[in-house]
Amino acid sequence: MRSFFLYANFDSMTNYRNLDADEIARLSAQFCQAEDWSKIRVAEGFTTANISHARFSGDITLGVFEKDILLPGGLKKKAGLHHVMLHNCTVGNNTLIENIPNYIANYNIGRDCYIQNVNLMLTEGESTFGNNTDVSVLNETGGREVPIYNRLSAQLAYIIAMYRHRPDLTERLRTMIREYSSALKSNRAHIGNGVYIINTGTIRNVCIGDRCRIDGASRLDNGTVNSNAEAPVYIGPNVTAEDFIISSGAYVSDGVVMSRCFIGQACHLAHLFSAHDSLFFSNCQGENGEACAILAGPYTVTMHKSSLLIAGMFSFLNAGSGSNQSNHMYKLGPIHQGVVERGSKTTSDSYILWPAKIGAFSLIMGRHVNHPDTSGMPFSYLIEHGSKSYLVPGANLKSVGTIRDAQKWPRRDKRKDPNKLDCINFNLLSPYTIQKMLQGINTLQGLKKTSGETSETYSFQSTTIKNHSLEKGINLYTLAVHKFMGNSIIKRLEGGAFADIDDLHRRMKPTDCLGQGEWIDLLGLIVPKQAVSNEIEHIVSTPGYTLEETEAFFRDMHKRYYDMEWTWVCDVMPRWYGKTYEQLTPEDIIGIVKKWNESVVALDRMLYDDARKEFSMVSRIGFGVDGSTEQRDFDFEQVRGEFESDAFVKMVCKHIEDKTALGNELIERLKSLANRM
């Protein structure tokens, strides 16, 4: 496996020749110098017309310089070399390099590039250009290092960082990455085709892919920018980066400072954001704040000043202003870590003292210092009140914000590269979250039984649950499980009429052998734990196993998700419905669909009521500043619109209608089958 651009800059079929005496004379007359003219080779068709004030040393290969380069503002410049010193360089056709205060050394530069006012650009010694750099995620003192490389995915990073209980696996994966990186080792860096670099400080030991634009960066040291024509990378003013890899489609600008970082596809870092020892995967956004030793899965977003993400694993996170965590208890150093599972939010000024583990799709409000573990209670509120951490199980299931997040994530996938590195499952309800709800129902019922139904509060994993919150949590989780199970059954039974009961059961028969048991979230990829365990054994027991095979495994799991999900649903049916899929009658399924419809409508009604709060009288405070009550209401409606015409509200209403119709259609087909039995 090789970096995609390193060997694509120059046409191997091009014939190169030495300069003739007349060309040397003309170049000398144009204020050019060479340490040894015989070491300069040029392409057929080369002319000296567009080269002036250039100095050459070492082995030099030049293309032809005959086309105009169109610059922003409509300015045209002829390709060529002006006021530059080149040492051991290859320059492709129709590239313009000018006004280089120091020099360019040991670089292969592609065609159609524009390099202007770059202080210094060189390759020093042999380099792997950021590949195989160890990044100390989660534990600042080490122990979970992930070696980065050009094609690192969120899924592979998760396994390397989190599966330290399998040292044989860790060492095997590290060896593969080390071998991959060794194959890239070179004493010459490469710049792809159509690259634009201006007004930049020092670039040292950095490979840059096609169509990259670097404008005003301060210093880039030991890295790779995996830009390509489909998904160019932009690096803007005052960026300082060392020991890094930046993936396709990324945007890094406005004073970003980073060290030992991997920046995933379509990530956006700007506005003085700083990061060290951190991995950011697809569509992450970081502005104004700081990240230290984090494993940031897809869609981790921190946009505000005074926000610090440290020593944690996150994905689909929305961090509020002033959110931070502590990994240091001033005893043995910054050795603690935390996990915030997918889809969570932190409110302004929230704080968590690590270690802690927060359940999926949770809302974190206030300060939490007692190390809560709420991973068994997804979709919950974790709220500080009177120095205690209160847990409200399932409350986020009825939050309009949760549903909006699920809708916007796919729309905000900015990856343009056809070769996507990360596998991302956007589903809110999945075997991963539903299994936790099933466990949550049992846990809450167990708390009620153990402590008594009349208890005002219950203790759970360093949190407090109020009595009414416990009851509501059981109800919300039950509705969500009915919704998910019904969704899966209805989807499975789509299509025409059923010939007979055997035909019904044939359609319900699982088609994938994987899916039973526990499911896990590999930073975006939702997958059965058994499948990962099987692949781990394959990795450690197969001498010729490659990184390409890990990529193929993750893609295969992603592709098979819905088939494996159905296997899981069938496995859960006896526990939830009291029957296997083979024992279900048409009447049973009709009852399931009716219960599903009731659950969907009930949850949608809650979302509807939650959305209505945004149109309450309280929400109108600040509108109609200088007017009457009527003017206030009119001002509000002009800005926010009316409740019934709100896009989300209309979506909820239509969702109720569509789901009801979908359920009724299946019920009619099942009734037809029942009448024929």
Language model features with spans:
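Membrane-permeabilization and membrane-interfacing ectodomains
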Residues: 178-186
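Glycine-rich hexapeptide-repeat left-handed beta-helix
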Residues: 12, 29-34, 42-65, 69-81, ...
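Long, structured ligand/cofactor-binding scaffold of large enzymes
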Residues: 83, 88-91, 183, 200
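Short, positively charged and aromatic/hydrophobic N-terminal segments
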Residues: 3-12
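Long, compositionally biased intrinsically disordered regions
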Residues: 117, 385-677
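Long, charge-dense tracts
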Residues: 102-103, 107-114, 119-129, 133-135, ...
